[in-house]
Each structure stands twice: as structure tokens, then as C-alpha cells.
From Swiss-Prot:
GO-annotated biological processes: translation
The protein's name in its UniProt record: Large ribosomal subunit protein uL4
Region span, Disordered: 44-71
Family in the record: Belongs to the universal ribosomal protein uL4 family.
DNA damage among keywords: no
HAMAP family: Ribosomal_uL4_B
Taxonomic superkingdom: Bacteria
Pfam families named in the record: Ribosomal_L4
NCBIfam families for the chain: rplD_bact (TIGR03953)
């Protein structure tokens, strides 16, 4: 199959298996959920009655005071006591096979092509690391919410995009399923397309 280059009177021949396969919603959902789960810190922690600060002495004798019996000031029902079922640091990551991950990326890229959300250009750069230059370039292309993927990370482009809302710049090795879905449009250079094809082959 061929992808039309927007900034040149030509087309780029690409693999049907990468840019023209059926959309596997279940696979994409599984991979996106796993990717998001892997981004969770999982560092929450609370103290049990064994970990809170306090004496181990029985507050008062068992019988004869008229008060409810009590064995520790660290009891969960006491103020400043431990938590009954204390949260523990947790690893939320989910295992995803390489074949599944690549399959999900191919599904997403193919769907972007079908929805006309993927724009392929020969080159994409700015002369200087100026936000104004990139903003004007995107305005000329009628783009606002956009992910720009280049073959190699362009320093000028990266710096120019840092202060633009809903604009992100990545190199071909930095793509992920969540980012591809999150933006309205995805701009890829011809070099990036070739690199992605090789990565997902």
C-alpha cells in the first residue's frame, strides 16, 4: 500500500501488515491498560499496629476500672493507632508479550490511516528553537492537537514544541500506544515511517 506525502508530489510504499491491518480493539485495549498500569508508581503505604510509634505497655489493668478492656495504644480503634488493613507498596505492571505489543501498535497505526489522522511528510523541522516558528508552521497545516514523530530527535523541533499545549515531539523509537491514541493527528516523517516499519517487522 502507499501513503501520500503531504509536502511532496509522491507517495511512500509501506507494508500492508503495519499500516493496513484490521483493528483489533480487544488487543489494543489490553495493551493500553497494561501500559497505563505500568506507569503507576504503586508507592502508597500505611502503618499497621506493629509499625506505629507507641509503647507496648497495657494502658490499664484488664478488670476493675469500669472502662473497656484495652491491651495496646496502637490498636486500630484508637486515635494514632495503626491501620487495620494497611496499604502496601504494590507493583501494578502487567505482562505483555512483544508480539502483542507490536500487534497493538500496528492496529493503532492502521486505524490512524483509515481515519485520516496520520499525516506523512518528507521532512518536518524548524530553522531555530522558537515556539513562534513551530506554532506558525502548525497553523499553516491546520494542526492543533498533534504528535510529531521524526526519524531522529530534532533538537530545534523538540525545544520549540515544549511550550505548546497539545503538541508533542518524539523520535521513532519513542512511540507508545497511549500517545498515538491521545492526539487528534499524528505527523510522521518518511524516515520515521521506515524506522517504525523496521521496528514492528
Amino acid at each position: 500500500m502507499e501513503l501520500v506525502l503531504k509536502d511532496a508530489q509522491s507517495a511512500l510504499t509501506v507494508s500492508e501488515t503495519t499500516f493496513g491491518r484490521d483493528f483489533n480493539e480487544a488487543l489494543v485495549h489490553q495493551v493500553v491498560v497494561a501500559y497505563a498500569a505500568g506507569a503507576r508508581q504503586g508507592t502508597r503505604a500505611q502503618k499497621t499496629r506493629a509499625e506505629v510509634t507507641g509503647s507496648g505497655k497495657k494502658p490499664w489493668r484488664q478488670k476493675g476500672t469500669g472502662r473497656a478492656r484495652s491491651g495496646s495504644i496502637k490498636s486500630p480503634i484508637w486515635r494514632s493507632g495503626g491501620v487495620t488493613f494497611a496499604a502496601r507498596p504494590q507493583d501494578h505492571s502487567q505482562k505483555v508479550n512483544k508480539k502483542m505489543y507490536r500487534g497493538a501498535l500496528k492496529s493503532i497505526l492502521s486505524e490512524l490511516v483509515r481515519q485520516d489522522r496520520l499525516i506523512v511528510v518528507e521532512t518536518f523541522s524548524v530553522e531555530a528553537p522558537k515556539t513562534k516558528l513551530l506554532a506558525q508552521k502548525l497553523k499553516d497545516m491546520a494542526l492543533e492537537d498533534v504528535l510529531i514523530i521524526t526519524g531522529e530527535l530534532d533538537e530545534n523541533l523538540f525545544l520549540a514544541a515544549r511550550n505548546l499545549h497539545k503538541v508533542d515531539v518524539r523520535d521513532a523509537t519513542g512511540i507508545d500506544p497511549v500517545s498515538l491514541i491521545a492526539f487528534d493527528k499524528v505527523v510522521m516523517t518518511a524516515d520515521a515511517v521506515k524506522q517504525v516499519e523496521e521496528m514492528l517487522a
